[in-house]
Regions:
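Metal-dependent phosphoester/phosphodiester hydrolase catalytic core
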Residues: 1-264
Length: 264
């Protein structure tokens, strides 16, 4: 194990310069024993600060944490979301994101964590990203259309706050609108994790829906499945598929491979 300490200067609201400290432990890579992972999802505001979960996680002493998405919800913090203007939307998100840090920060001080955004993290009730395209204006309350509701600047803030500690992306080239990507590989404890997004590149139901009502709700069995099973539709996207083809062939220093996503 190695101890670490981060010092950072900050000028407070009174103009005073202060030095703040953040310290913890970087634990030895657990390559000689079975890896213990704790996986969490959907941190809804009614459970904040999730004390029973945190208490049990401390008791279990996992080697690594996995937060698979919805680290924030629109209702978190007791205040509604603000979609615009852009900077207000970003501050609105950050306030809710800080609450996630307050709840789980002490654990993450000493335990490595994988964190991946999902739909609610970018203020959507469902997300069919279409490779990063924008949603048509005036459709913020429709959960069955392809694209991102919020601006790319805000989405990039979400991606940076939640994923910047991960290994570098397999292919860092931004997608539509200049949106950052974060799909990557992490080896820990002789386990190789492929970390992907099954939301960002996904085609939307509006491309196939020929039924009444919500486009993402099939209420009657389809007579012809070819309507929704077309070669031009994407789930993980070609770029992530190329990554997975490379990842699955490399078994150097690993015993098992695990694919991490949000909601297949």
């Amino acid at each position: 194990d190695h101890q670490y300490r981060i010092l950072y200067p900050l000028t407070d609201i009174h103009g005073n310069n202060q030095i703040f400290e953040y310290s913890g432990t970087i634990k030895k890579d657990p390559v000689n024993r079975q890896l213990k992972m704790a996986a969490m999802t959907c941190q809804f505001h009614t459970g904040f600060p999730y004390s029973p979960v945190v208490k049990n996680l401390k008791f279990k002493e996992p080697d690594i944490l996995y937060f698979s998405g919805d680290q924030i919800y629109e209702q978190n913090g007791g205040y509604p979301i603000k979609r615009e203007p852009e900077n207000t939307a970003i501050l609105n998100y950050l306030g809710k994101w800080y609450m996630f840090g307050w709840a789980f920060g002490e654990l993450m001080r000493d335990i490595p964590a994988i964190c991946t955004p999902d739909d609610h993290d970018v203020f959507q009730g469902n997300l069919w990203g279409g490779g990063g395209i924008p949603r048509p204006s005036g459709t913020a309350n429709s959960d069955d259309l392809m694209g991102f509701t919020q601006t790319v600047k805000m989405v990039n803030v979400v991606n940076t706050t939640q994923c910047s500690h991960l290994p570098d992306p397999y292919d860092p080239e931004p997608i539509e609108q200049g949106m950052k990507v974060w799909y990557t590989c992490l080896n820990y404890g002789r386990v190789s994790f492929a970390i992907v997004s099954d939301r960002v590149f996904k085609s939307g139901p509006d491309l196939v829906a020929n039924w009444e009502g919500r486009k993402d709700h099939i209420t009657e069995p389809l007579k012809d499945l070819s309507v929704i099973d077309r070669p031009d539709l994407e789930l993980l996207g070609k770029r992530q598929e190329i990554f997975l083809q490379s990842w699955i062939r490399n078994w150097e220093d690993v015993d098992i491979k695990v694919l991490l996503s949000q909601t297949l």
